[in-house]
Amino acid sequence: MDKKSARLRRATRARKKISELAAHRLVINRTPRHIYAQLIAPCGSQVLAAASTVEADLRTTVKSTGNAEAAVAVGKAIAERAIEKGIKTVAFDRSGFKYHGRVKALADAAREAGLQF
């Protein structure tokens, strides 16, 4: 089993457990260059809010888009957008990535901005 298939297996297992909770899901995806966050409805088929380093307003505020500083900016942005929609409690879906580095920075920033998970 290679590294990617192991990560996808972990992600599938976590998503199965989160779907049983019937809670809003904060989904993270990261690439070497960017980080993305989406808020998904409990039904699983509707994206309620999104933030990423691809967006022009976030790209102008950070020096580089592939580091922890950029992840903090995305975490704050997704939390603000979720609270605008009236969502304060979410389930954190790290997509099989380690809770370390950019993923942890995004999660901590979202918590500081008011999201609970």
From Swiss-Prot:
Gene Ontology CC, one term: cytosolic large ribosomal subunit
Gene Ontology MF terms: 5S rRNA binding; structural constituent of ribosome
Record flagged with keyword Cell membrane: no
Keywords: Ribonucleoprotein, Ribosomal protein, RNA-binding, rRNA-binding
GO BP, sorted A to Z: translation
Biological function: This is one of the proteins that bind and probably mediate the attachment of the 5S RNA into the large ribosomal subunit, where it forms part of the central protuberance.
Name this polypeptide is given: Large ribosomal subunit protein uL18
Protein source organism: Pseudoalteromonas atlantica (strain T6c / ATCC BAA-1087)
